[in-house]
Amino acid sequence: DLYDVHSDSPTKSWYGLGDWDVMASGNWIGDGGRPSLPSSSTLDLIGAIDPIVPDYHLDGNFLLKPISQGGTPLKIEIAYGEYIWITLRSEIGFAAGLPGHGILVEQQDLSFGDLDSNLVNTDPSKPWVKIVEADGNDALLRGADYGSSGDPFSFGDRFGHTGKQIWDNRGRLVPWTITVNSLSVD
């Protein structure tokens, strides 16, 4: 489960991936009638996707199809066992009830938590996976919301080394920048 399954341990309550993943609060979208799809990290865990793994040393353009239409996410290793997942989330199909749409960025650190004991997202200071929120307010981490329209990145946004900066869990700024050059769900 990607919500805080044990909110009293070890720190405080938070909402994990919130409405962005069926394994968090996304199973309750539309009163449970239209749950969200799993996140890219969840789809990878169950072997349901084969992500694009770009070489960040090279410039490149990537056209992402919405995950709700069978699209494939990008996966970038930023440290040993730590990844950035980049996924297009649209308002189509099971994604229709999401709190927003655009480029959703997850940061996953496999060294945090205990997957076998279902203790992966128990501590917001050491999440197994979290959303890198475009608006920068960290509302999911703080337990202030279950996801918002400000979480995904949109046309013109940048993230990585510049724009919304991404640091690995060892305190190193990533060496690449991604710019959202266009955004369409067609």
Regions found by a protein language model. Name each.
Residues 62-186:
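Extracellular low-complexity, Gly/Ser/Thr-rich intrinsically disordered linkers
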Residues 1-98, 109-111:
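Extracellular hydrolytic enzyme modules, especially secreted metalloproteases
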